[in-house]
Amino acid sequence: MIRLFLLFLLVSLPAYSQEDYSKFLPNKEFTPGDPLIGLNPAETICVSGYTKKARAVSESTKRKVFELYNTTPQQDRYEVDHLISLELGGSNDIRNLWPQSYTTQPWNAYKKDKLENKLKRMVCSGQIQLEQAQQEIANDWIAAYKKYIGE
């Protein structure tokens, strides 16, 4: 009987140790990510002030994003975030936008911002290709965070 119980525990452990963080990721159907194609990082994202020039999401688009996700706009709780950030060559298209929480734990907009900054530094220093950074953050930003930042 004890062996059977130990076997059950051994088989069950992977299921309990796997972190389910899907609720912290955007819905891929609504927000697959939308990178700008053919950017030369040295002439765009690595130039100081690039994101200020590139940022152009209208209030009506922001409202549509919140409607799409059936979320009430609350500026103190959510931002309309670029899945592929502007600093990684993401577009302002609605396919690249989602409401990301500031307050959820452990994964939130502040953690994603930390990842975006790290990936931009890596792209601009030649440690990673822009396309790879775009793909990794669009595919699963939390996995990319764990890979490049840890924690």
Segments from the language model and where they lie:
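Sec-dependent N-terminal signal peptides
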Residues: 2-13
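Nuclease and nuclease-like effector domains acting on nucleic acids or nucleotide cofactors
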Residues: 14-77, 88-151
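Short active-site segment of divalent metal-dependent hydrolases/proteases
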Residues: 85
